[in-house]
Amino acid sequence: MGTMIRHTFTHRCGALLCALALGSSTMAATAAAKPKKGQMQKLRQRPVWAPTGGRYASLDGAFTALANDASFFEANPAGSANMTHGELAFFHTTGFGSFHAETLSYVGQSGNWGYGASMRMFFPESGFDFSTTTEPVCTPASNPIKQRGAIGIINFARRIGGLSLGANLKAGFRDAQGLQHTSVSSDIGLQWVGNVAKSFTSEEPNLYIGLAATNLGLTVKVSDKIENCTSTCEKCGCCKERCCCNGKKACCKDCDCNCPCQDCNDKGTVHATDTMLRAGFAYRPFSWFLFSLGATTSMNVQTLASSDAKSLYQNLAYSIGAMFDPFSFLSLSSSFRINHKANMRVGVGAEARIARIKLNAGYRCDVSDISSGSGCTGAKASHYLSLGGAILLGRN
C-alpha cells in the first residue's frame, strides 16, 4: 500500500513539474512587457551579491524556514545552529548568456552555537578579465549588465531550545561595466524547529518556521564620475543620436542602454541597500515528503518615505516548494514563485548522498519583462544552472 502511494505521488510530482515548466514557457511566449530603460543607476541600491547552489538554488523563497544546508546564508542566517551536520561545500553557478559564479562555503556547530563562512566570486560569461585597464562599457538595456567581483560572508548563530538567532556580516566589491561599488551589509534571522504530529522516526525535526531580514547595509561608489561618455556608448542607439551623452551632462535615466555614466553621483557617494524581508514555513508530514511556503518583499530605508510604504506590498513575492525523497540517498526538490508584476520563477533540483558526500544540481528559470532598445515588447526566460558538492563534517 505504501509503495503504491509513493508511486502515485511520484507521478503527480512529475505532472506538477511539467505543468510548471509549461506555464513558464507559455508566459515567456505571450506576456507583454513595458519598454526597458537603463538599469545602471539602480546598482547603488543593490548590495554586492553572488548566487549560490545547494537547496537554495531550487527552493529559493521557499527555503527561508528550512535553511538546512550550506546554502542557508541567503535564506536565513539562523540556520547554522539548527543543522544536524557541519558542511564544507563548493558550488558552481552559471547564468546562461550572463555570468559564472564560484562559491566555497563552510558551516559548523559547537554546542549550541552555529558558525560559518562563505567566499564567492563572480564574473561575466566571457571570463575573468580582471585587467586594471578595462574601460567603461555601454550595452543595450535588454542585455544583462556584465559584473565581476567578490564577496565574503561570516555567520554566527545561537540555539536556545528549538529557537535559534543568527546574523551574517558581508563585505564585497563589484565592477559593473566600469561602475564600481563596495558594499558592507548584514543579515539577521530567526528560526524555530520542532516536532508536530510526527508519524516517523528521525533525528531531524518535521516543522520549521523562519523569519529573516537580509542586506541591511550600504554601498559606496569607488569609481570616478563620468561626464562625457559618447565614445564609450558606441553601441547605444540613443547615445549615437547624442540625446543623452552630449558632452554636457551624464546619461539621462531614460537612455535605452546600460552605461556607467548613468550614475551621476560623485566618487565616495553612500547609498542604503535594498533590504529583503523574508518569512517561511515548512512541514514534513511523511518521512519522504516536505512542503514549504515563503513570502518575500523588499524595501530601501533611504527611499521608503518618498516611495510610500505601498512599495512593501507591490514588491511582495510568494513561493511554494516541495521536497520528495524516493530513496534514502536521493532527494528531489521543486519550487514556484510569482510576484505582483506576474514575473515567475520555477526551480527544480536533485541531491544524492553517498556516505559523507553530497552531490547536488539545481535549475532555475526566471520569466520577466524585457524589451529591446527599439521598443519591441515581450517577455524573456532566463536560465540558471548550479552544480555542487559537500562533505558532511560530523554530527551536531
Swiss-Prot record:
It comes from the Bacteria. The lineage of its organism: Bacteria, Pseudomonadati, Spirochaetota, Spirochaetia, Spirochaetales. Pfam families: UPF0164. This is UPF0164 protein TP_0858. Coiled coil: none annotated. InterPro entries: UPF0164 (IPR005362). Belongs to the UPF0164 family. Keywords: Signal. It comes from Treponema pallidum (strain Nichols). Residues 1-28 form the signal peptide.
